[in-house]
């Protein structure tokens, strides 16, 4: 069963809630908290069942067919998430975001955390290795590369003239994830993803430009405006701990 081929209105309210979370984070495996388990549905269930070697079952959700499902104990999620991250996936954690005693009907749930290869800081992370998240920005026929280790807070910036040198620098960092604007077209991005399992995350150009303007003006960073990949990393790191939506 494919999520894109079904009508959301035909499902139970809880499954509609899951579908809304998945629609907001389509490139992540959604861990949807139900009681003492995180459950995955539809395509995510197929992927998680295969990659985590756990049983694939089904769930009655008001639809004419049972929805593909698999689940893991909530207290053990970090190990399962780390395994998915090591295989190049992203994980979105969905929790209840309101007090059940105050809820009118179904308790509201939303994504409270996103774990990616470049932002994982759980206990399972190898402390002997840097865990670099990199950002690329193209300007005036050159590339600015910013990279940060979110587990230590270290951040660096460099300018590179051509694609091949850029790829070599990223590989030398053993970067787990590269962030760039959606409009950036570089052949090396496919190579980094396909041959080296580096996750490529794209950020919306318009929203980031608005964020750059706010940060540059609000924090008096005008002299650093050509180095905005650093700012893009900060913005995308904030994005990995999303606030509940209204």
Residue ranges of model-derived segments:
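Charged catalytic and DNA/RNA-contacting regions of genome-maintenance
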Residues: 1-241
């Amino acid at each position: 069963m494919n999520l894109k081929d079904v009508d959301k209105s035909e499902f139970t309210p809880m499954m509609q809630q899951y579908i809304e979370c998945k629609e907001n984070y389509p490139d992540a495996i959604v861990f949807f908290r139900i009681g003492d388990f995180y459950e995955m549905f539809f395509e995510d269930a197929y992927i998680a069942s295969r990659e985590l070697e756990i049983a694939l079952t089904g769930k009655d959700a008001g639809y004419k067919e049972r929805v593909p499902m698999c689940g893991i104990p909530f207290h053990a999620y970090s190990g399962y998430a780390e395994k998915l991250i090591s295989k190049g996936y992203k994980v979105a954690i969905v929790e209840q975001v309101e007090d059940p005693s105050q809820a009118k009907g179904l308790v509201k749930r939303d994504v409270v955390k996103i774990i990616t290869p470049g932002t994982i800081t759980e206990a399972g992370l190898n402390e002997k290795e840097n865990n670099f998240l990199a950002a690329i920005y193209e300007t005036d026929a050159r590339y600015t590369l910013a990279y940060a280790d979110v587990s230590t807070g270290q951040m660096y910036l460099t300018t590179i003239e051509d694609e091949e040198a850029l790829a070599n620098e990223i590989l030398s960092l053993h970067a787990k994830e590269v962030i760039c604007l959606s409009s950036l077209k570089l052949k090396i991005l496919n190579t980094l993803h396909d041959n080296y399992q580096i996750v490529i995350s794209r950020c919306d150009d318009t929203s980031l430009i608005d964020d750059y303007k706010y940060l540059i003006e609000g924090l008096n960073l005008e002299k650093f405006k050509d180095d905005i990949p650093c700012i893009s990393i900060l913005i995308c790191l904030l994005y990995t701990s999303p606030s509940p939506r209204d």
